[in-house]
Amino acid sequence: MKKILKLSIVLLGALFVLIGCRSESKSVFVLQTEHSKVTYTYVYDKGNDTVLSLTTDIVVRLSSVPEYATAARQRRDEIVNQMKATEGVKVTSVDSEKEIAFTVEIDMKKFKLDDSESRAKAPSLYETMDVALIKKDGKVSFSASKENIERLGFVEQKEEKK
């Protein structure tokens, strides 16, 4: 009985070590302009340099010109509707008087970057993903994706130590 208990404790300890040593990391990149802010949040496997998920937050500040606000909302709604039927994609949107926003969550286990049928249905989504998700050696590489978006002006946000 004591041997079983000791073995169980050792196995439980090993399990905690394995869980604690996962190589999953998160990085946030921001591109801010006068009228908009785009944030990419990558969750990736550090050891394999593979992107696991990508969350894109887009916030557009509306001008005081009603026609511009209406056109911006219509364009956002078109883009959101294109994405809704795409597998591995979750889209949410928020409206206020001063800004519109939407969030696109990509689960790389389900999302097919090379799917021509989905690409035809949601061209705006794939135009963005072609910039944010870069393949290298047959997989979506975090380091290649990071290099590409930094070249376009995105700045990595360093996590503050508590």
Describe the predicted segments one by one.
Residues 1-9:
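Bacterial N-terminal signal peptides that target proteins for export
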Residues 11-15:
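Alpha-helical transmembrane segments
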Residues 23-162:
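Subset-of-secretome marker
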Residues 17-20:
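C-terminal motif of bacterial Sec signal peptides marking the signal peptidase cleavage site
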